[in-house]
Structures are given as structure tokens and as C-alpha cells.
Amino acid sequence: MKKLIQTIAVAAMMALAIVSCKKNQETIADEPQETVKNADKVLQYIKDLGFPAESIVDNGNEFVVEEDILFPKNMVVPFVTEGPKTEQYYTGSIVNSTNKLNIRVFIDPSMTSMTSEINSGIAQWNGVPNSTLRFNVVTAAPYDILIKDENLGSGTCGQGQFPSGGSAGALIKINKSYIAGNSFAQRARTICHEFGHCISFRHTNWAARGESTATNVPGVTGTDASSLMNGGQCNSGATVLSTKDKDATAALY
């Protein structure tokens, strides 16, 4: 009798284990489908912002446009109410009035050797007149932006995410070894530029680079050769925010 009870108990445990494994397998199977569905939404959102399909690069867990703008496939897609936004210097999705007052930046250990450059880039955005936009470095979670080193290959100095859901873009990748030989001012410029993407700015020189069409931030007109947000100018571009960069920041924030 005792042996029979033990046999039944073992059988029950095996059945439970099989059911548990099957349930876990079903959960795992569902997750990729949800990821694919959200990736499709993100892809459509990018197109709605005005980026042509041929400019969108699938890079595994994210989409990349204009070489240094990131859209994670798992991002929360903002609700677009006005149809395609085909012409703009910014995405139309900005950091909200509460979050802009304290955008918390966490420096990954891989980037601590460039802390001074990061602080320099932050100081430029924090110093814009008539703007309440503020970045602050924090040493632990919670944080809004993670800045880390990543090998992005030759020709790409950094990448940054656009804002989503009222929060700043959550990630900046810096190709640290690639820009290490640049001057301090140019390294800080790269980092400052990527912070600009995190608060919604696109490349000021989009037309010259053949990127998707854009219009000015309201009240800030014309091209700007001095803009720090010009793309394709790693190690050669402006190292300080131009007057128009500052005017655009004040207009949005």
C-alpha cells in the first residue's frame, strides 16, 4: 500500500511538471509574437514621422534611421492624431512638462572615462536661456537615460533614442574607441548631439544629407551651418549649440 501511494505521488509530480513545462513553453511562444506585433507598430510609427521606408534599418532589437537615431522595437508607441508628420526638425513627441525639469542620466561603467565630456554636453543643454529643460547625472536607478559604450562600427560615432510617452529617449550609445582620438570638444559634441535626439531634435541639415523632409521648429527658420544638431559631422561639426539651436530648445521647452 505504501509503495502504491509513493507511485501515485511520483506520477502526480511528473504530471504537474509536464503541465508546468507546457505552460512555460506556451508563454515563451507567445512573447515573440507580441514582440513582432509591437515591432510592426514601431515601424509604422517611424513611417508616420516621415522617414521613408528605405531609410529604416532593422538592427535586431531596434530600428535605426539617419544613422544615429534609435527606435527600440519594444518601445511604447505614442498615439499619432494628426496623420503622417512628414516635415519637421523634431518628432512631435517631446519630453513632457514634468519630466523635462529633471531628466536623470545614468553613466554606465563603460563610459565613466568620458564623464567630463558627458557633463560638458549636459551643461550646454542646461544652459539654454528661456528653457526649463534640465539634465542631471545620477549614480543609481531610477534614471531616464542610460549612456553606454558600444562598438557601432566605423563611421558611426553615437546613437540616441527619440522621446516616447512624455519621457526622454532612454538610451545613448557612444562608439567610445572610435571617437577616443578626437579632441575633448569634439567628443563632448558627439555626446551633446545624441542628447539632442533624446529630447526630440532631428538633424538640422536633413536636406543636404538627403534625409526625409522636415520643417523648422515653430519660430525658428532657415538652415544653420553652425548647428550642433547637424548630422554627419563627427569630429568636424560645431562644438557649441548655435543661436538657432538654443532658440529651438526654448521654443519646445
Model-identified regions with their sequence ranges:
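Bacterial N-terminal signal peptides that target proteins for export
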Residues: M1-A9
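C-terminal motif of bacterial Sec signal peptides marking the signal peptidase cleavage site
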Residues: L16-S20
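Disordered inhibitory propeptide/activation segment of secreted metzincin zinc metalloprotease zymogens
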Residues: N24-S113
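Acidic helix-start/capping segments at beta-turn-to-alpha-helix junctions
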Residues: N102-I107, F135-S154
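A short alpha-helix/helix-coil micro-patch that ends at or immediately precedes a cysteine
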Residues: D108-N136
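Catalytic zinc-binding patch centered on the HExxH motif and its immediate surroundings
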Residues: M114, L146-L171
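Active-site scaffold of zinc-dependent metalloenzymes
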Residues: Q159-S183, A225-C234, A251
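The catalytic-center signature of Zn2+-dependent metalloproteases
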Residues: F184-A185, R189-K244
